[in-house]
Amino acid sequence: MSLSETATQAPQPANVLLEVNDLRVTFATPDGDVTAVNDLNFTLRAGETLGIVGESGSGKSQTAFALMGLLATNGRIGGSATFNGREILNLPERELNTLRAEQISMIFQDPMTSLNPYMRVGEQLMEVLMLHKGMSKAEAFEESVRMLDAVKMPEARKRMKMYPHEFSGGMRQRVMIAMALLCRPKLLIADEPTTALDVTVQAQIMTLLNELKREFNTAIIMITHDLGVVAGICDKVLVMYAGRTMEYGKARDVFYQPVHPYSIGLLNAVPRLDSEGAEMLTIPGNPPNLLRLPKGCPFQPRCPHAMEICNNAPPLEAFSPGRLRACFKPVEELL
């Protein structure tokens, strides 16, 4: 089945769908406040994909949880996030539930823990449509089958009667993608959607998301540590470290001409098929403890280009159209 058979009209690509300004996420802990996301800024248009990249603890997932209103109870949000012209941070719970169901959806990292093991997959899909679209049970069943077909689930009608444990990891992730798209959201947030999958299934899921993006004109935020995933699907890339933006720009620019030592380190750590026998490169050290961040640039203790001026926090500045970075090292010395 063609995805276009189930697609509905979406905003024109020229329109800014999501605008995030100075997003800040802080958690109160017994040891003090931890700032997980520090003054994050980006925009996303309909049909675009933004990749948010970084090591564990960089603030990627907390950015997504803040936008979805899913922070832990000790979390606090600052800044602004405007979706379709509407401020969505700190919305009342009822409005937030409606927004999450009908406008913004999320694919979580582990589909096995996101699906109810005691309910048939079909029942879980149908529940979304009956609750949020007011469909009858028969209508919800047929629409769920159509969406499973759309995500290329083999024998979709038969699979409706199966339980999550009867599916492979890749098939469970297809179920989660189908569920996320049932209400035709304008924004899809995918949090490490291929981490637990083998490389063949990863490629299939990435191809599927690309097709869905084109057919539904859905904007996607792809949260990942895998730069190969970013290269395959993203239009823009935001590189995060210790809750801050290190580099931001078009995906092809960041890949072929990275201009921040952290971005360069991440790319150098990706295994290459044309470097047989070459040493596997890594970034020395570990991400910082957010309770005890180093003075100045948070990447300074691990940076091969660290200078005395790095004891001051580098501002995030534009150095060419559409590109930002936070680093004192001259651009030409990193290219």
Curated annotation (Swiss-Prot):
Query: Catalytic activity annotated for this protein?
Result: a [peptide](out) + ATP + H2O = a [peptide](in) + ADP + phosphate + H(+); L-alanyl-gamma-D-glutamyl-meso-2,6-diaminopimelate(out) + ATP + H2O = L-alanyl-gamma-D-glutamyl-meso-2,6-diaminopimelate(in) + ADP + phosphate + H(+)
Any one Gene Ontology MF annotation carried by this entry is:
ATP hydrolysis activity
Q: Which UniProt keywords apply?
A: ATP-binding, Cell inner membrane, Cell membrane, Membrane, Nucleotide-binding, Peptide transport, Protein transport, Translocase, Transport
Query: EC?
Result: 7.4.2.6
* One GO-annotated biological process of the protein: protein transport
Q: Where in the cell is it found?
A: Cell inner membrane
User: What does this chain do?
Assistant: Part of the ABC transporter complex OppABCDF involved in the uptake of oligopeptides, including the cell wall murein tripeptide L-alanyl-gamma-D-glutamyl-meso-diaminopimelate. Responsible for energy coupling to the transport system. Plays an important nutritional role and is involved in the recycling of cell wall peptides. Binds ATP.
State the family it belongs to.
Belongs to the ABC transporter superfamily.
Q: What protein name is recorded for this chain? A: Oligopeptide transport ATP-binding protein OppD
The gene it comes from is oppD
